[in-house]
Design a protein with these regions (language model features):
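Membrane-interface aromatic/basic loop that binds lipid-linked glycans or pyrophosphate carriers
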Residues: 1, 29, 50-54, 58-60, ...
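Short, well-formed alpha-helical segments that are part of the catalytic scaffolds
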Residues: 11-29
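Acidic donor-binding segment of Leloir-type glycosyltransferases
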Residues: 24-64
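Glycine-rich, basic loop-to-helix element that forms the pyrophosphate-binding segment
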Residues: 65-82
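Donor-binding/catalytic cores of nucleotide-activated saccharide
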Residues: 72-75, 92-192, 197-201, 212-225
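Short aromatic/hydrophobic "clamp" motif used to bind/position activated sugar donors
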Residues: 87
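Catalytic core of nucleotide-sugar-dependent glycosyltransferases
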Residues: 206-215, 220-248, 253, 267-278
Length: 309
């Protein structure tokens, strides 16, 4: 690059080259925008590495991680290579909307720490609109239309995904913020710390980023491993919020306990132990789920050796 770019767009990739091509096609290939694609050890049976997406682009950096460590690790590799004043994150199966580049140009020289943008969501295959990101747009619009401190805090603390926002790189660097290198929910703690350390924010509700949903992606995984990881990230996040006097924004954990018990009592008590380690508030949201949890527990009591499941 002949000059320092304004923006660094970090995109982790794993086994979805066609969707990555779509994502890259939505990004201008210009010197103001540094694109960093980090491949997380994709399979050569799926990806043609001799013609890897982005190879033909002048302002795109390709990194190849030979150990499959997940999107969190991949994003951390991207952060180490980021040269822009601003950070933008994207998933390889998502894409930017045309309004993105005109909108962000308004903030090139702004002093904000975070600029929140509107989000659209569609089915990845047929591009049919879905409601996956409705909650984010709801808190975004509420904070925009009624910018009380409570509404602004709700937006900052509960917008726990890295995309749909522009982040000042110095905020991340100066506070040594990195992504968790877990298989699931690796972006939650990063987004939480970015929110907690930010001082000035801006809201633009114009839809600039499109989130897609497809069968079999990590977001939809409901295995015991996924549940344990997401639960631990949640109670860790709740602990961080308590330490920073935002306990009112803690996420109730009773839902996780109910889902764990639906899998097996063994998984349920694994979550209890994790919660104790992080001093979790087991009673927040408990009333809503008590009857369901007891019902599932009694059902397991009728099985043979439920604790071994």
């Amino acid at each position: 690059m002949t000059k320092q770019p304004l923006y660094s767009i970090i995109i982790p990739h794993y086994n979805s080259p066609t969707l990555l091509i779509r994502c890259l096609a939505s990004i201008p290939d210009c010197e103001d925008i540094q694109v960093i694609v980090i491949d997380d050890n994709s399979s050569s049976d799926i990806v043609d590495f001799s013609h890897f997406p982005g190879t033909e682009r002048k302002y795109t950096t390709l990194l190849f991680n030979k150990n499959n460590k997940g999107a969190g690790h991949a994003r951390n590799l991207g952060l180490a290579q980021a040269q822009g004043k601003w950070l933008i994150f994207a998933d390889a199966d998502d894409y930017f909307l045309p309004a993105m580049w005109e909108i962000i140009a308004q903030y090139n020289n702004s002093t904000y720490d975070i600029i929140y943008l509107g989000i659209n969501s569609v089915d990845s295959d047929i591009l049919r609109p879905i409601s996956r990101c409705q909650y984010i747009n709801d808190v975004l619009n509420t904070a925009k239309n009624n910018p009380t401190q409570e509404n602004l805090d709700t937006l900052r603390i509960r917008h726990i995904v890295p995309w749909g926002k522009i982040i000042r790189k110095s905020l991340v660097q100066n506070n040594h913020i990195l992504f968790e290198e877990t298989k699931y929910s690796n972006d939650v703690i990063f987004s939480t710390y970015v929110a907690l350390f930010s001082n000035t924010i801006c809201i633009n509700t114009t839809q600039c980023y499109c989130v897609t949903s497809r069968q079999g992606n990590l977001t939809s995984a409901t295995t015991a491993e996924a549940l344990r990881t997401r639960f631990e990230v949640t109670v860790k996040r709740n602990q961080i919020l308590r330490q920073h006097n935002y306990k009112q924004h803690q996420i109730p954990i009773a839902t996780y306990l109910y889902l764990a018990l639906c899998i097996s009592p063994k998984v349920f008590f694994q979550l209890i132990c994790i919660g104790i380690h992080y001093h979790a508030n087991f009673f927040k949201g408990w009333q809503r789920w008590t009857r369901k949890i007891i019902g599932v527990f009694l059902k397991h009591q009728k099985t043979t050796n439920p604790w071994q499941q």
